[in-house]
Amino acid sequence: MPGNSFGKLFRVTTFGESHGPAVGVVIDGVPAGLPLTVEDIKFELEFRRPGRLYVSGRREKDEPEILSGIFNNRTTGSPIAVIVRNTDVVSSFYEEIRYKPRPGHADLPFIMKYGYENWDYRGGGRASARETVGRVIAGAVAKKLLMLADTWIAGHLRSLGPEELNEEVTFEEVLCSKYSPVRASKKVLEEKYEALIKKATQEGDSYGGIAEVITKNPPIGLGEPVFDKMKAELAKAIMSIPAVTGFEYGLGFMVSKMKGSEANDEIIRKDNKIGWKYNYAGGILGGLTNGEDLIVRCAFKPTSSIRKPQKTIDLRNLEETYISVIGRHDPAVAIRGVTVVESMVALTLVDHAMRAGVIPLVKLTEEQGNIVQQRWERYVRSCKPMEESQL
């Protein structure tokens, strides 16, 4: 099963299955001298951890164990290996799907490709969103390394089911959405999302949603003009996330309904610098980052595993039957998915920042390490509940 690695210079390989002993990641290419602790990783992991309000009831502590690559709270330049042990596994929930593939899930395609006898039906195996633990761990490292360029990344849930944000949102509000149980950037929207989730849970159903991630102060010129355009790199990274079905940046598909005179973003002076009036392009032109806020969105489909009975095939006799999936599943995977999208944006940007020479390949100086640490601490302080930010 190839295709488990991402990136060229900052290279990430995830491993593990949903109901195996552990999931984890190996991160290769991290320069020496980056201040990094378990707490830095746990800060990001907490926002995708199950067992919280409105998400999967699986009670995982998600305690990262660093196996290599860090000494005295600094990276050594060698590969960083981190595992998270699976401590709340209940495989008995999945005995029925052993013979009844779930509609909307990867069960049947996996059986068709790898063979029934090789299929790990427990919790979806490698196709489970549990795999994204490794992405978020690597994303935490990437986010901290990007602090060298003072680049900040934060996301929120732009829509959930029929409810959506129809007003402007500040980056500070997006940062604070980390502490919203439904990743809403506005209090009134949070209440609407919560009502939808409660309704879906009662009905044994689920909802999809749209995640939006904003990158402040991205380095200029990241990406390459042809096959490695930044939009293409981000699209691949984000579309690789389980349950993601669509990607756009800037105005996205809306631009197809506009005239050139409407869609072209005028070039103006902004704070004594050259810039764009509205940032319609979402921070990418010609495949390169242009210094404006990098704005991407992606669509998450509704959780496939639901209690409502759905038609499927019993593989023992190839007859049609029904399945009602019993287990601990998210009523909306998009909620925890926001953190994963942030991580994939960070992994893409840090890899290109290293390719462009913005971030050193070998080591950070002591001064650079101190700058990174100061900015990271400011970032962590800025991520606080809405009430504390008086939103």
UniProtKB/Swiss-Prot annotation:
Which residues make up the binding site for NADP(+)? 48
Q: What GO cellular-component annotations does this UniProt entry give?
A: cytosol
Q: Which GO terms describe its molecular function?
A: chorismate synthase activity; FMN binding
One of this protein's Pfam families, by short name?
A: Chorismate_synt
Q: List the keywords (alphabetical).
A: Amino-acid biosynthesis, Aromatic amino acid biosynthesis, FAD, Flavoprotein, FMN, Lyase, NADP
Co-factor binding details? Reduced FMN (FMNH(2)).
A Gene Ontology BP annotation from the UniProt entry? chorismate biosynthetic process
Which cofactor is essential here? FMNH2
| Residues passing through the membrane, by range | none
Reply yes or no: does the keyword Metal-binding apply.
no
Positions bound to FMN: 126-128, 286, 301-305, 328
> Which catalytic reaction applies to this protein?
5-O-(1-carboxyvinyl)-3-phosphoshikimate = chorismate + phosphate
Q: Which superkingdom?
A: Archaea
Assigned EC number: 4.2.3.5
Pathway annotation from the record: Metabolic intermediate biosynthesis; chorismate biosynthesis; chorismate from D-erythrose 4-phosphate and phosphoenolpyruvate: step 7/7
Instruction: Tell me the HAMAP family matching this sequence.
Output: Chorismate_synth
Free-text function comment from the UniProt entry: This reaction introduces a second double bond into the aromatic ring system.
The UniProt similarity line reads: Belongs to the chorismate synthase family.
Protein's name according to its UniProt entry: Chorismate synthase
